[in-house]
C-alpha cells in the first residue's frame, strides 16, 4: 500500500489532555482507520453547569459543535451530520463519538466547562 493510500485511510484526532480551565480529556491522541468509531471523553471542572465540545481545523478554524447545560444539550447546531453524537449522562462526564470516521474529521477536538 502506497503512502498516499495510507494517508487517505488513516485519521488523526488530537485532543488537549488538560486545558487551562482544568478540564480533563482523553485520549490525548487518537489515530484510527477510516470507518472506525472514535470516542473522546471529557471530565469538566466539578461544579460547572456548562460543557462545550469544540473542533479546530486549519481550514475552518474553531467551531462549536455542541454545548450542554446541567447535562441537557442546548445547542447542537454545530454537530456535523449523523456520524457525530455527544452525550452527558451526568455532571462529571461527557463523550463525543464519531462513527464512522472519515479523513475530513481530522482535527483538534476539545471540551471546556463553565459556571
Curated annotation (Swiss-Prot):
<keyword id="KW-1064">Adaptive immunity</keyword>
<feature type="domain" description="Ig-like">
    <location>
        <begin position="22"/>
        <end position="115"/>
    </location>
</feature>
<comment type="function">
    <text>V region of the variable domain of T cell receptor (TR) beta chain that participates in the antigen recognition. Alpha-beta T cell receptors are antigen specific receptors which are essential to the immune response and are present on the cell surface of T lymphocytes. Recognize peptide-major histocompatibility (MH) (pMH) complexes that are displayed by antigen presenting cells (APC), a prerequisite for efficient T cell adaptive immunity against pathogens.</text>
</comment>
<keyword id="KW-0325">Glycoprotein</keyword>
<comment type="subunit">
    <text>Alpha-beta TR is a heterodimer composed of an alpha and beta chain; disulfide-linked. The alpha-beta TR is associated with the transmembrane signaling CD3 coreceptor proteins to form the TR-CD3 (TcR or TCR). The assembly of alpha-beta TR heterodimers with CD3 occurs in the endoplasmic reticulum where a single alpha-beta TR heterodimer associates with one CD3D-CD3E heterodimer, one CD3G-CD3E heterodimer and one CD247 homodimer forming a stable octameric structure. CD3D-CD3E and CD3G-CD3E heterodimers preferentially associate with TR alpha and TR beta chains, respectively.</text>
</comment>
<dbReference type="Pfam" id="PF07686">
    <property type="entry name" value="V-set"/>
</dbReference>
<dbReference type="InterPro" id="IPR013783">
    <property type="entry name" value="Ig-like_fold"/>
</dbReference>
<dbReference type="InterPro" id="IPR013106">
    <property type="entry name" value="Ig_V-set"/>
</dbReference>
<keyword id="KW-0472">Membrane</keyword>
<feature type="signal peptide">
    <location>
        <begin position="1"/>
        <end position="21"/>
    </location>
</feature>
<dbReference type="InterPro" id="IPR050413">
    <property type="entry name" value="TCR_beta_variable"/>
</dbReference>
<keyword id="KW-1015">Disulfide bond</keyword>
<dbReference type="GO" id="GO:0007166">
    <property type="term" value="P:cell surface receptor signaling pathway"/>
</dbReference>
<dbReference type="GO" id="GO:0002250">
    <property type="term" value="P:adaptive immune response"/>
</dbReference>
<keyword id="KW-0732">Signal</keyword>
<feature type="glycosylation site" description="N-linked (GlcNAc...) asparagine">
    <location>
        <position position="90"/>
    </location>
</feature>
<protein>
    <recommendedName>
        <fullName>T cell receptor beta variable 12-4</fullName>
    </recommendedName>
</protein>
<dbReference type="InterPro" id="IPR007110">
    <property type="entry name" value="Ig-like_dom"/>
</dbReference>
<keyword id="KW-1279">T cell receptor</keyword>
<dbReference type="GO" id="GO:0042101">
    <property type="term" value="C:T cell receptor complex"/>
</dbReference>
<dbReference type="InterPro" id="IPR036179">
    <property type="entry name" value="Ig-like_dom_sf"/>
</dbReference>
<keyword id="KW-0391">Immunity</keyword>
<keyword id="KW-0675">Receptor</keyword>
<keyword id="KW-0393">Immunoglobulin domain</keyword>
<dbReference type="GO" id="GO:0005886">
    <property type="term" value="C:plasma membrane"/>
</dbReference>
<feature type="disulfide bond">
    <location>
        <begin position="42"/>
        <end position="111"/>
    </location>
</feature>
<keyword id="KW-1003">Cell membrane</keyword>
Amino acid at each position: 500500500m502506497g503512502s498516499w493510500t495510507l494517508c487517505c485511510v488513516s485519521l488523526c484526532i488530537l485532543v488537549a489532555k488538560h486545558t487551562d480551565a482544568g478540564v480533563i480529556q482523553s485520549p490525548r491522541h487518537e489515530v484510527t482507520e477510516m470507518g472506525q468509531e472514535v470516542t473522546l471523553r471529557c471530565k469538566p471542572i466539578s461544579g460547572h453547569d456548562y460543557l462545550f465540545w469544540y473542533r479546530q481545523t486549519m481550514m475552518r478554524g474553531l467551531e462549536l459543535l455542541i454545548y450542554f447545560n446541567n447535562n441537557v444539550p442546548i445547542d447542537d447546531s454545530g454537530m456535523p451530520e449523523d456520524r457525530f453524537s455527544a452525550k452527558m449522562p451526568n455532571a462529571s462526564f461527557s463523550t463525543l463519538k464519531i462513527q464512522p470516521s472519515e479523513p475530513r474529521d481530522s482535527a483538534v477536538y476539545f471540551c471546556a466547562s463553565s459556571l
